[in-house]
Amino acid sequence: MVHCAGCERPILDRFLLNVLDRAWHVKCVQCCECKCNLTEKCFSREGKLYCKNDFFRRFGTKCAGCAQGISPSDLVRRARSKVFHLNCFTCMMCNKQLSTGEELYIIDENKFVCKEDYLNNNNAAKENSFISVTGSDPSLSPESQDPLQDDAKDSESANVSDKEAGINENDDQNLGAKRRGPRTTIKAKQLETLKAAFAATPKPTRHIREQLAQETGLNMRVIQVWFQNRRSKERRMKQLSALGARRHAFFRSPRRMRPLVDRLEPGELIPNGPFAFYGDYQSEYYGPGSNYDFFPQGPPSSQAQTPVDLPFVPSSVPAGTPLGAMDHPIPGHHPSSDAQRFTDIMSHPPGDSPSPEPNLPGSMHSMSAEVFGQSPPFSSLSVNGGYGNHLSHPPEMNETAVW
Protein backbone atom coordinates (compact mmCIF):
# COMPACT_ATOMS: atom_id res chain seq x y z
CA MET A 1 0.00 0.00 0.00
CA VAL A 2 1.42 3.41 -1.07
CA HIS A 3 0.99 6.30 1.33
CA CYS A 4 0.77 9.98 0.38
CA ALA A 5 3.76 12.18 1.35
CA GLY A 6 1.45 15.09 2.10
CA CYS A 7 -1.35 13.60 4.21
CA GLU A 8 0.32 10.22 4.96
CA ARG A 9 -2.82 8.34 4.00
CA PRO A 10 -2.94 5.42 1.59
CA ILE A 11 -3.41 6.36 -2.02
CA LEU A 12 -6.54 4.58 -3.35
CA ASP A 13 -7.03 6.86 -6.36
CA ARG A 14 -6.56 5.71 -9.92
CA PHE A 15 -3.93 8.44 -10.57
CA LEU A 16 -1.16 9.75 -8.35
CA LEU A 17 1.66 12.29 -8.64
CA ASN A 18 5.31 11.60 -8.07
CA VAL A 19 7.07 14.64 -6.59
CA LEU A 20 10.58 14.51 -5.13
CA ASP A 21 10.62 10.73 -5.55
CA ARG A 22 7.59 10.44 -3.36
CA ALA A 23 3.93 9.64 -4.13
CA TRP A 24 1.30 12.30 -3.59
CA HIS A 25 -2.42 12.53 -3.90
CA VAL A 26 -3.46 14.83 -6.70
CA LYS A 27 -5.29 17.06 -4.29
CA CYS A 28 -2.32 17.15 -1.87
CA VAL A 29 0.08 18.69 -4.38
CA GLN A 30 -0.71 22.33 -3.68
CA CYS A 31 1.12 25.51 -2.59
CA CYS A 32 1.48 25.75 1.12
CA GLU A 33 1.07 29.54 0.94
CA CYS A 34 -1.82 30.21 -1.44
CA LYS A 35 -3.31 26.64 -1.46
CA CYS A 36 -3.49 26.57 -5.24
CA ASN A 37 -3.16 23.23 -7.04
CA LEU A 38 0.17 22.63 -8.69
CA THR A 39 -0.33 20.82 -11.97
CA GLU A 40 2.60 21.69 -14.20
CA LYS A 41 5.53 22.61 -11.94
CA CYS A 42 6.18 23.33 -8.33
CA PHE A 43 8.99 24.53 -6.07
CA SER A 44 10.06 22.83 -2.89
CA ARG A 45 11.93 24.03 0.16
CA GLU A 46 12.28 22.19 3.48
CA GLY A 47 9.74 19.52 2.40
CA LYS A 48 7.07 22.08 1.49
CA LEU A 49 5.71 22.85 -1.94
CA TYR A 50 5.36 26.39 -3.30
CA CYS A 51 4.07 27.94 -6.42
CA LYS A 52 6.41 30.00 -8.49
CA ASN A 53 5.32 33.38 -7.24
CA ASP A 54 5.29 32.49 -3.57
CA PHE A 55 8.60 30.70 -3.77
CA PHE A 56 10.43 33.68 -5.31
CA ARG A 57 8.65 36.06 -3.05
CA ARG A 58 9.78 34.18 0.02
CA PHE A 59 13.16 32.78 -0.94
CA GLY A 60 14.14 34.83 -3.96
CA THR A 61 16.18 38.06 -4.15
CA LYS A 62 14.82 40.79 -1.93
CA CYS A 63 14.16 44.31 -3.09
CA ALA A 64 16.50 46.72 -1.31
CA GLY A 65 13.75 49.34 -1.19
CA CYS A 66 10.75 47.49 0.21
CA ALA A 67 12.56 44.35 1.50
CA GLN A 68 10.09 42.14 -0.39
CA GLY A 69 10.91 39.29 -2.73
CA ILE A 70 11.21 39.92 -6.43
CA SER A 71 9.24 37.76 -8.80
CA PRO A 72 10.97 36.43 -11.93
CA SER A 73 8.43 38.26 -14.06
CA ASP A 74 9.05 41.62 -12.36
CA LEU A 75 11.16 44.31 -13.95
CA VAL A 76 13.98 45.43 -11.72
CA ARG A 77 16.71 48.06 -11.62
CA ARG A 78 20.16 47.58 -10.20
CA ALA A 79 22.20 50.13 -8.29
CA ARG A 80 25.64 48.98 -7.24
CA SER A 81 25.06 45.46 -5.87
CA LYS A 82 21.40 45.86 -4.95
CA VAL A 83 18.21 45.15 -6.88
CA PHE A 84 15.07 47.31 -6.72
CA HIS A 85 11.52 47.14 -7.99
CA LEU A 86 10.65 49.76 -10.54
CA ASN A 87 8.23 51.32 -8.11
CA CYS A 88 10.87 51.34 -5.39
CA PHE A 89 13.54 52.93 -7.59
CA THR A 90 12.27 56.53 -7.18
CA CYS A 91 13.54 59.85 -5.86
CA MET A 92 12.85 60.23 -2.18
CA MET A 93 12.09 63.96 -2.56
CA CYS A 94 9.98 64.26 -5.70
CA ASN A 95 8.95 60.55 -6.01
CA LYS A 96 9.96 60.59 -9.64
CA GLN A 97 10.76 57.15 -11.05
CA LEU A 98 14.39 57.07 -12.10
CA SER A 99 15.23 55.68 -15.49
CA THR A 100 18.24 53.78 -16.74
CA GLY A 101 21.37 55.92 -17.19
CA GLU A 102 20.08 58.83 -15.16
CA GLU A 103 22.44 60.44 -12.66
CA LEU A 104 21.40 60.02 -9.07
CA TYR A 105 22.75 60.31 -5.54
CA ILE A 106 22.50 57.36 -3.16
CA ILE A 107 21.79 58.02 0.51
CA ASP A 108 22.08 55.28 3.14
CA GLU A 109 22.57 52.63 0.42
CA ASN A 110 18.84 52.33 -0.30
CA LYS A 111 17.54 55.86 -0.83
CA PHE A 112 17.91 57.90 -3.98
CA VAL A 113 17.81 61.57 -4.87
CA CYS A 114 17.73 62.83 -8.43
CA LYS A 115 20.35 65.26 -9.61
CA GLU A 116 18.07 68.30 -9.78
CA ASP A 117 16.75 67.92 -6.26
CA TYR A 118 20.21 67.27 -4.88
CA LEU A 119 21.70 70.41 -6.44
CA ASN A 120 18.76 72.55 -5.39
CA ASN A 121 18.91 71.26 -1.85
CA ASN A 122 22.68 71.78 -1.68
CA ASN A 123 22.42 75.39 -2.86
CA ALA A 124 19.64 76.08 -0.41
CA ALA A 125 21.73 74.66 2.42
CA LYS A 126 24.64 76.95 1.51
CA GLU A 127 22.37 79.99 1.36
CA ASN A 128 20.84 79.15 4.73
CA SER A 129 24.22 78.70 6.40
CA PHE A 130 24.37 82.35 7.47
CA ILE A 131 21.59 81.85 10.03
CA SER A 132 21.30 78.08 10.43
CA VAL A 133 22.95 76.67 13.53
CA THR A 134 23.51 73.16 14.76
CA GLY A 135 23.62 71.75 18.24
CA SER A 136 27.17 70.49 17.74
CA ASP A 137 28.57 74.06 17.64
CA PRO A 138 29.04 75.08 21.27
CA SER A 139 29.65 78.73 20.41
CA LEU A 140 26.20 79.16 18.85
CA SER A 141 24.16 77.08 21.26
CA PRO A 142 22.03 78.86 23.86
CA GLU A 143 23.83 76.96 26.61
CA SER A 144 27.09 78.80 25.90
CA GLN A 145 27.76 81.11 28.83
CA ASP A 146 31.37 82.09 28.22
CA PRO A 147 31.69 85.39 26.32
CA LEU A 148 35.24 84.48 25.28
CA GLN A 149 33.91 81.51 23.35
CA ASP A 150 31.43 83.79 21.64
CA ASP A 151 34.18 86.16 20.56
CA ALA A 152 36.28 83.31 19.17
CA LYS A 153 33.56 82.52 16.64
CA ASP A 154 32.90 86.08 15.51
CA SER A 155 34.80 85.77 12.26
CA GLU A 156 33.06 82.49 11.36
CA SER A 157 29.55 83.81 11.79
CA ALA A 158 30.23 87.26 10.35
CA ASN A 159 28.12 86.61 7.27
CA VAL A 160 25.13 88.51 8.63
CA SER A 161 25.28 92.28 8.86
CA ASP A 162 22.79 94.79 10.10
CA LYS A 163 21.61 95.38 6.55
CA GLU A 164 21.00 91.69 5.97
CA ALA A 165 19.17 91.45 9.26
CA GLY A 166 17.02 94.49 8.46
CA ILE A 167 13.56 94.55 7.01
CA ASN A 168 13.45 93.04 3.54
CA GLU A 169 9.98 92.42 2.15
CA ASN A 170 10.96 91.71 -1.46
CA ASP A 171 13.09 88.62 -0.83
CA ASP A 172 10.57 86.17 -2.28
CA GLN A 173 10.30 88.13 -5.52
CA ASN A 174 14.08 88.36 -6.03
CA LEU A 175 14.77 84.71 -5.34
CA GLY A 176 13.28 83.41 -8.59
CA ALA A 177 13.07 79.66 -9.05
CA LYS A 178 15.59 78.87 -6.31
CA ARG A 179 14.14 79.25 -2.88
CA ARG A 180 16.45 80.82 -0.33
CA GLY A 181 16.36 79.89 3.29
CA PRO A 182 14.25 81.78 5.80
CA ARG A 183 15.67 85.07 6.97
CA THR A 184 15.29 86.53 10.41
CA THR A 185 13.50 89.86 10.22
CA ILE A 186 14.58 92.32 12.90
CA LYS A 187 12.29 95.29 13.28
CA ALA A 188 13.47 98.82 13.94
CA LYS A 189 12.46 98.78 17.59
CA GLN A 190 14.17 95.44 18.16
CA LEU A 191 17.28 96.74 16.41
CA GLU A 192 17.39 99.79 18.68
CA THR A 193 17.12 97.56 21.74
CA LEU A 194 19.98 95.37 20.52
CA LYS A 195 22.16 98.39 19.72
CA ALA A 196 21.56 99.87 23.17
CA ALA A 197 22.46 96.56 24.79
CA PHE A 198 25.60 96.33 22.64
CA ALA A 199 26.69 99.82 23.67
CA ALA A 200 26.35 98.77 27.31
CA THR A 201 27.87 95.28 27.07
CA PRO A 202 29.46 94.15 23.79
CA LYS A 203 29.78 90.61 25.19
CA PRO A 204 26.55 89.84 27.01
CA THR A 205 26.19 86.81 29.22
CA ARG A 206 23.49 84.21 28.86
CA HIS A 207 21.32 85.93 31.47
CA ILE A 208 21.43 89.20 29.52
CA ARG A 209 20.64 87.38 26.29
CA GLU A 210 17.62 85.77 27.92
CA GLN A 211 16.37 89.17 29.00
CA LEU A 212 16.87 90.53 25.48
CA ALA A 213 15.02 87.54 24.06
CA GLN A 214 12.07 88.28 26.32
CA GLU A 215 12.10 91.98 25.47
CA THR A 216 12.49 91.64 21.71
CA GLY A 217 10.76 88.31 21.14
CA LEU A 218 13.72 87.03 19.12
CA ASN A 219 15.42 83.68 19.46
CA MET A 220 18.46 83.52 21.72
CA ARG A 221 20.56 82.08 18.92
CA VAL A 222 19.64 84.97 16.66
CA ILE A 223 20.60 87.44 19.37
CA GLN A 224 23.89 85.69 19.98
CA VAL A 225 24.77 85.67 16.28
CA TRP A 226 23.82 89.34 15.99
CA PHE A 227 26.20 90.28 18.81
CA GLN A 228 28.99 88.27 17.26
CA ASN A 229 28.52 89.93 13.89
CA ARG A 230 28.35 93.34 15.53
CA ARG A 231 31.65 92.79 17.34
CA SER A 232 33.27 91.63 14.13
CA LYS A 233 32.00 94.70 12.31
CA GLU A 234 33.37 97.00 15.01
CA ARG A 235 36.79 95.37 14.73
CA ARG A 236 36.81 95.79 10.96
CA MET A 237 35.86 99.45 11.25
CA LYS A 238 38.67 100.09 13.75
CA GLN A 239 41.20 98.40 11.50
CA LEU A 240 40.06 100.39 8.47
CA SER A 241 40.13 103.68 10.37
CA ALA A 242 43.63 102.99 11.70
CA LEU A 243 44.85 102.09 8.22
CA GLY A 244 43.31 105.24 6.76
CA ALA A 245 44.94 107.42 9.43
CA ARG A 246 48.37 105.93 8.74
CA ARG A 247 47.90 106.37 5.01
CA HIS A 248 46.76 109.99 5.47
CA ALA A 249 49.77 110.80 7.65
CA PHE A 250 52.12 109.24 5.12
CA PHE A 251 50.82 111.17 2.13
CA ARG A 252 50.21 114.47 3.90
CA SER A 253 53.61 114.83 5.60
CA PRO A 254 56.23 112.79 3.82
CA ARG A 255 59.74 112.84 5.14
CA ARG A 256 61.84 115.38 3.38
CA MET A 257 65.28 114.22 2.41
CA ARG A 258 68.02 116.63 3.44
CA PRO A 259 71.45 116.85 1.86
CA LEU A 260 73.88 114.48 3.47
CA VAL A 261 76.59 117.09 3.91
CA ASP A 262 74.31 119.50 5.77
CA ARG A 263 73.38 116.84 8.32
CA LEU A 264 77.00 115.97 9.13
CA GLU A 265 79.14 117.87 11.57
CA PRO A 266 82.67 118.99 10.67
CA GLY A 267 85.14 116.19 11.13
CA GLU A 268 82.62 113.45 10.36
CA LEU A 269 82.41 111.26 7.26
CA ILE A 270 82.41 114.24 4.85
CA PRO A 271 84.28 117.12 6.60
CA ASN A 272 84.98 120.58 5.30
CA GLY A 273 87.70 120.55 2.71
CA PRO A 274 89.25 117.70 0.77
CA PHE A 275 91.41 115.17 2.60
CA ALA A 276 90.76 116.85 5.92
CA PHE A 277 90.28 113.52 7.61
CA TYR A 278 94.07 113.18 7.65
CA GLY A 279 94.26 116.28 9.80
CA ASP A 280 92.79 114.38 12.77
CA TYR A 281 95.62 111.85 12.72
CA GLN A 282 98.33 112.46 15.31
CA SER A 283 101.49 110.57 16.06
CA GLU A 284 105.03 111.28 17.13
CA TYR A 285 106.02 111.89 13.51
CA TYR A 286 102.83 113.50 12.17
CA GLY A 287 101.61 116.45 14.08
CA PRO A 288 98.05 117.71 14.12
CA GLY A 289 96.83 119.95 11.36
CA SER A 290 97.05 119.85 7.59
CA ASN A 291 99.94 117.93 6.11
CA TYR A 292 99.80 119.76 2.82
CA ASP A 293 100.73 123.37 3.68
CA PHE A 294 102.78 124.97 0.92
CA PHE A 295 104.58 128.26 0.86
CA PRO A 296 105.89 129.18 -2.63
CA GLN A 297 108.04 132.02 -1.24
CA GLY A 298 109.19 130.01 1.75
CA PRO A 299 107.52 129.71 5.16
CA PRO A 300 106.86 132.79 7.22
CA SER A 301 109.53 133.93 9.60
CA SER A 302 107.44 132.91 12.58
CA GLN A 303 107.13 129.40 11.22
CA ALA A 304 110.57 129.08 9.65
CA GLN A 305 112.24 125.86 10.62
CA THR A 306 115.24 124.01 9.40
CA PRO A 307 114.68 120.71 7.66
CA VAL A 308 116.28 118.90 10.56
CA ASP A 309 113.70 120.33 12.98
CA LEU A 310 110.79 119.38 10.78
CA PRO A 311 108.97 116.24 11.97
CA PHE A 312 108.26 115.17 8.40
CA VAL A 313 109.42 115.78 4.86
CA PRO A 314 107.55 118.84 3.58
CA SER A 315 105.34 118.28 0.64
CA SER A 316 105.11 120.72 -2.21
CA VAL A 317 101.64 119.64 -3.20
CA PRO A 318 98.92 122.12 -2.25
CA ALA A 319 95.81 120.94 -0.50
CA GLY A 320 93.24 119.53 -2.85
CA THR A 321 95.66 118.94 -5.75
CA PRO A 322 95.46 115.45 -7.29
CA LEU A 323 98.53 113.45 -6.51
CA GLY A 324 100.78 112.66 -9.44
CA ALA A 325 104.20 113.25 -10.96
CA MET A 326 105.48 116.82 -10.57
CA ASP A 327 107.72 117.12 -13.63
CA HIS A 328 107.89 120.92 -13.86
CA PRO A 329 108.84 123.41 -11.15
CA ILE A 330 106.02 125.53 -9.85
CA PRO A 331 106.19 129.19 -10.92
CA GLY A 332 107.48 131.47 -8.21
CA HIS A 333 109.21 128.66 -6.42
CA HIS A 334 112.92 128.99 -5.54
CA PRO A 335 114.58 125.63 -6.03
CA SER A 336 117.79 126.67 -4.33
CA SER A 337 116.26 126.92 -0.87
CA ASP A 338 114.43 123.61 -1.29
CA ALA A 339 117.60 122.00 -2.65
CA GLN A 340 119.51 123.22 0.36
CA ARG A 341 116.91 121.77 2.72
CA PHE A 342 116.82 118.42 0.94
CA THR A 343 120.63 118.40 0.83
CA ASP A 344 120.78 118.82 4.57
CA ILE A 345 118.39 115.94 5.02
CA MET A 346 120.35 113.69 2.70
CA SER A 347 123.70 114.52 4.29
CA HIS A 348 123.19 112.66 7.56
CA PRO A 349 126.02 110.37 8.69
CA PRO A 350 125.94 106.83 7.32
CA GLY A 351 125.18 105.49 10.76
CA ASP A 352 121.87 107.28 10.91
CA SER A 353 120.43 106.07 7.64
CA PRO A 354 121.54 103.55 5.05
CA SER A 355 122.77 105.03 1.74
CA PRO A 356 122.64 103.46 -1.69
CA GLU A 357 125.72 103.04 -3.83
CA PRO A 358 126.98 106.47 -4.97
CA ASN A 359 127.11 107.69 -8.55
CA LEU A 360 124.26 105.41 -9.64
CA PRO A 361 121.78 107.39 -11.67
CA GLY A 362 118.18 106.95 -10.85
CA SER A 363 118.83 105.07 -7.59
CA MET A 364 116.13 105.15 -4.95
CA HIS A 365 116.90 106.55 -1.52
CA SER A 366 114.53 105.34 1.20
CA MET A 367 114.16 107.13 4.46
CA SER A 368 115.18 105.04 7.44
CA ALA A 369 112.36 103.79 9.54
CA GLU A 370 114.50 104.30 12.61
CA VAL A 371 114.65 108.05 12.03
CA PHE A 372 111.30 108.82 10.45
CA GLY A 373 109.21 105.87 11.58
CA GLN A 374 106.65 104.56 9.15
CA SER A 375 107.22 106.35 5.87
CA PRO A 376 104.59 108.87 4.80
CA PRO A 377 102.67 108.45 1.56
CA PHE A 378 105.60 110.09 -0.30
CA SER A 379 108.54 107.97 0.85
CA SER A 380 110.73 107.73 -2.25
CA LEU A 381 112.80 110.41 -3.88
CA SER A 382 114.43 109.88 -7.27
CA VAL A 383 117.31 112.28 -7.89
CA ASN A 384 119.19 112.24 -11.17
CA GLY A 385 122.92 112.59 -10.84
CA GLY A 386 123.39 111.07 -7.39
CA TYR A 387 123.64 112.92 -4.10
CA GLY A 388 125.87 115.84 -3.18
CA ASN A 389 126.22 118.66 -0.75
CA HIS A 390 124.96 121.13 -3.34
CA LEU A 391 122.36 120.50 -6.00
CA SER A 392 123.20 122.37 -9.21
CA HIS A 393 119.67 122.18 -10.59
CA PRO A 394 116.19 121.64 -9.18
CA PRO A 395 115.63 117.97 -8.44
CA GLU A 396 112.91 116.18 -10.34
CA MET A 397 110.62 114.60 -7.82
CA ASN A 398 108.53 111.55 -8.69
CA GLU A 399 105.94 111.12 -6.00
CA THR A 400 104.09 107.86 -5.77
CA ALA A 401 100.81 107.81 -3.86
CA VAL A 402 100.16 104.67 -1.84
CA TRP A 403 96.57 104.45 -0.60
UniProtKB/Swiss-Prot annotation:
List keywords of the entry alphabetically: Activator, Developmental protein, Differentiation, DNA-binding, Gastrulation, Homeobox, LIM domain, Metal-binding, Neurogenesis, Nucleus, Repeat, Transcription, Transcription regulation, Zinc
The effect annotated for C28G is:
Disrupts ldb1-binding. Produces an active form
Q: Does the keyword Cytoplasm apply?
A: no
Q: Which GO terms describe its cellular component?
A: nucleus; transcription regulator complex
Q: Which SUPFAM superfamilies match?
A: Glucocorticoid receptor-like (DNA-binding domain) (SSF57716), Homeodomain-like (SSF46689)
Q: What induces it?
A: By retinoic acid and by dorsal mesoderm-inducers including activin, derriere, dvr1/vg-1 and nodal.
Give the LIM zinc-binding domain ranges. 4-54, 63-117
| Segments for region (Disordered) | 131-185, 318-366
Q: Key word Transcription present in the record?
A: yes
GO biological process terms on file: anterior/posterior pattern specification; axis specification; cell migration involved in gastrulation; chordate embryonic development; muscle organ development; nephron tubule development; neurogenesis; neuron differentiation
Q: In which tissues is it expressed?
A: Exhibits a biphasic expression pattern. Initially localized to the Spemann organizer region of gastrulae, leading to expression in prechordal mesoderm and notochord. In the second phase, expressed in the lateral mesoderm and neural plate, eventually concentrating in the pronephros and the CNS. Expressed in the pronephros primordium by late gastrula (stage 12.5) and becomes restricted to the tips of the tubules and ducts as kidney development progresses. In the CNS, becomes progressively recognizable in anatomically distinct structures during larval development.
List the molecular function annotations (GO) for this entry: DNA-binding transcription factor activity, RNA polymerase II-specific; RNA polymerase II transcription regulatory region sequence-specific DNA binding; sequence-specific DNA binding; transcription coregulator binding; zinc ion binding
What ranges does the record list as Polar residues composition bias? 131-147
User: Which segments cross the bilayer?
Assistant: none
Q: Provide the protein's localization.
A: Nucleus
Where in the chain is the DNA-binding region found? 179-238
Q: Where is the composition biased (Basic and acidic residues)?
A: 150-166
Q: Which Pfam families match?
A: Homeodomain, LIM
Stated role: Involved in the establishment of the body plan via the Spemann organizer during gastrulation. Transcriptional activator required to induce organizer gene expression downstream of siamois. Promotes head formation by binding to 5'-TAAT'-3' elements in the promoters of head organizer genes cer1 and gsc to stimulate expression. Binds as a complex with siamois and mix-A/mix.1 to the cer1 promoter, and with ldb1 and otx2 to the gsc promoter. Also involved in neural induction via the organizer, including a role in notochord formation.
Which comment does the entry carry about domains? The LIM domains exert a negative regulatory function and disruption of the LIM domains produces an activated form. In addition, two activation domains and a negative regulatory domain exist C-terminally to the homeobox.
Subunit comment for this entry? Answer: Interacts with ldb1 via the tandem LIM domains. Both LIM domains are required for optimal binding and binding relieves the inhibitory effect of the LIM domains and activates lhx1. Binding to ldb1 also prevents degradation of ldb1 by rnf12. The stoichiometry of lhx1 and ldb1 is important for their function and an excess of ldb1 can inhibit lhx1 function. Interacts with the N-terminal region of rnf12 by a homeobox-dependent mechanism.
The identity of this protein, by name, is: LIM/homeobox protein Lhx1
Q: Which organism is it from?
A: Xenopus laevis
